[in-house]
Structure formats: C-alpha cells, structure tokens
Amino acid sequence: MADEGGNPRDLPPVGGHAALSRHIGQSLMADEFDMSFFRDKPLDHGFFSPMSALLPCDESWPVQIVPLQVGVLQLPIPTARRCYKLGQALRRAIESYPEDLKVAIVATGGVSHQVHGERCGFNNPEWDAQFLDLLVNDPQRLTEMTLAEYATLGGMEGAEVITWLIMRGTLSANVERKHQSYYLPSMTGIATLLLENRDQALPAPVNERHRQHMQHQLAGAEQLEGTYPYTLERSAKGYRLNKFLHRMIEPQWRQRFLSEPEALYREAGLSEEESDLLRRRDWRGLIHYGVIFFVLEKLGAVLGVSNLDIYAAMRGQSIEDFMKTRNQQVRYSVAGKAPN
C-alpha cells in the first residue's frame, strides 16, 4: 500500500498472480512492447480506490491481480492508438496462458478533469458521454485523436482516459454493455462502465503458435553450455539474493555485511541455501541459483575480489590458468577509491 502523503489507507494487501504476470510480460515483449518489471512496488489509489468500492476487502481480497502501470502524466506518453494496440496484445497474452482462468480487465483513470493551472476545475459531461459511447461502439475512432484533442475536450489530466483503450483493446469488436453510470461530485468526472465479451474461443493451435512466438528469441540458447539466460523465472527465484547484493551500494549495508553477516542474512530473510552460497563465496553456485552477475561484481568489490577472480571461479579454473586465456594480464573491479 503506497503512502501518498498522509499515511497509507487502512486496507489489506492484495496478492498477485506471479505466473500469469510473467507470461503476460514475456508475451508483450515478444509483441514488441518494451515493458519494465517491478517487485516491491506499492500500489496507490489507482488500484485501491475503485477496487475497494467494487469488492469486499475487510480482511483480504477475493482476487489475485496483475498490475499494469502506464505513465500518462509525464510526457512523452503513449498515443491512444498505442494503448489500444497494447490491449490487443494483452488479449493474446491472456488467451494463450495455458491455465483456464477467469480474467477481468479493469481500466482506471478519471474522465474529464483538470487539476492544475488556471483551467483547473474544467469538466465536460457531454464529452464524457460521447467518449463512453465511442469506447463501446467505435473504439477505433478514439485511437485517431491526439493528446491535445483529448486535453481540449476533457482536460489535461482527463487525457488519462486513453488507458481505457487498453481495456477495450482486450475485448472483441462487439461487446455487451452490462452497466454504465456517471457522477460528477466535484473536480473529476467519475464513470463506471461494465462490458462483457462476445468473442469465441480460439482454436488450440492458434494459442500454441503464440506461445512458440514468445519463445522465438531464446530458441536454441538452452544448448549453450554454461549459459543461464536471466529470465523472469530466474529473476523471481533469485530476487531476495539479488536485492541483498544490490544493497552493497549502501556504505552502512556493506559494513554490516563485513562485520555481522549472519545477522544481516537473517534480517534480509535469506534462506539457509542462499546464506550458505554467500558464506562459501560460491560464485558459480550463485549464478546457477539465479543471481545476476552485475550484483556479484558488487560483492566482489566489497570483498576485494576482482572480476577476473570471479570469472575464473565460475569456469572452475585457477586465476593463473584463466589469465592465460586473456590477451592482457590485468585484473579489475567496480570498486572506487576509499573515502578519506
């Protein structure tokens, strides 16, 4: 739960669906949408405000979620057309997920409003009604509008409704409007729209072909000896260790690591296996486990171990034998000068 300035709201945490999240991420990347992936990222009112009104949440939530955050305030931002295409790609991702799940796509963001400058307080209920009608019946027309046109009709912050096109892109051309409401209490138009798909299930070979498409870029890499692509699955497994080692950039953290490592392992919630890999300085084992090299070299800098020594250990060679394979006999690390 994000603290947005006045302490977090009194709501329970919500669980995610990690496997579906990874599948969606990999599918969107395969469809050429450049995604960033997060752990430990608090959610704000964009999720909790609408969902706490829709679902019971006294002690827990009855759903698992996959948050998809799209920046629409700091320019440059995606176009309306790009958002719609993202929705279409999201549909392919969900339909190709091998497990049979019920999935609802929730779009958030206020309709007409502006909350900055001399134009703050601007609303346009007529545009809001037109937008909702177009979203249901002719979403392609909405993809032709520029950000300036959205801002003119609905306020600068009201342009965030382009994210609703992501939701609409996941649905079939024809949808059933189950519910619609509109409310303008103060600064922001609040609309609720419930749509139901009218599509048919795809033949199984279509979804299988998409899953193969998702694997295309790495096809064959599994045959490379001693090579471990840093996939989302490996990242998830090694997350605690990678987070622990990344904190070596903090002077106090690395000092505590050198003086009281066991206490630090416990504080970070490392498993016994993870702690033992660090105790033994098992460079190869750390890579096998799911640690990315670029935090291993931070550990090496703290311990006074060069990158070349780590490379040699990963290859199972002495540093002398490894150096014979290099053009220059030089050792280096990411360590800087110690402060005076």
Curated annotation (Swiss-Prot):
InterPro entries: Gallate_dioxygenase_C, LigA_sf, Xdiol_dOase_LigA, Xdiol_dOase_suB. Its EC number is 1.13.11.57. GO terms for biological process: gallate catabolic process. The keyword Phosphoprotein does not apply. The active site is at 45 (proton donor), 113 (proton acceptor). Induction: By gallate. Its cofactor is Fe(2+). One of its GO terms (molecular function) is ferrous iron binding. Disulfide bonds: none annotated. Transmembrane segments: none annotated. Gene3D superfamilies: Dioxygenase LigAB, LigA subunit, LigB-like. Optimum pH is 7.0. It catalyses: 3,4,5-trihydroxybenzoate + O2 = (1E)-4-oxobut-1-ene-1,2,4-tricarboxylate + 2 H(+). Pfam families: LigA (PF07746), LigB (PF02900). Keywords: Aromatic hydrocarbons catabolism, Dioxygenase, Oxidoreductase. Ring-cleavage dioxygenase that acts specifically on gallate to produce the keto-tautomer of 4-oxalomesaconate. Mediates the first step of gallate degradation pathway. Belongs to the LigB/MhpB extradiol dioxygenase family. This is Gallate dioxygenase. It comes from Pseudomonas putida (strain ATCC 47054 / DSM 6125 / CFBP 8728 / NCIMB 11950 / KT2440). The lineage of its organism: Bacteria, Pseudomonadati, Pseudomonadota, Gammaproteobacteria, Pseudomonadales.
